[in-house]
């Protein structure tokens, strides 16, 4: 029965596991905050990359590398990874710049502005590490 759901359970567990790893990296950097596990986008390793890479790997093994299911999961992975490295990362850069401008601008002192999130998206290294984790977990899950 677990095999029926393994294509979704294992990638989800991989994403949760990489979120836990991310907390470990945050702790090493002296930036440990348990909220980052659920409300943060970004950091090492990428749980989004791990999830979609694990899913695509498992679908490839289960349905075949030339199947339509694998093609769909691969396109989903590419879109997700491109979004994480490109668009969402740029949002974080903009948030950081806007927060600094508001803090430094004299006129901003008379008005309260919300602090924008700065931890969005991933660096290419974070995506590669997360994706490698996902691929390895997917291979191990299919081999075992």
Regions found by a protein language model. Give the residues of each.
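Helix-loop-helix hairpins and the membrane-proximal interhelical loops
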Residues: 1-20, 28-31
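Membrane-embedded catalytic cores of phosphoryl/pyrophosphoryl-handling enzymes
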Residues: 16-20, 33-144
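Hydrophobic residues in alpha-helical segments
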Residues: 27-28, 60
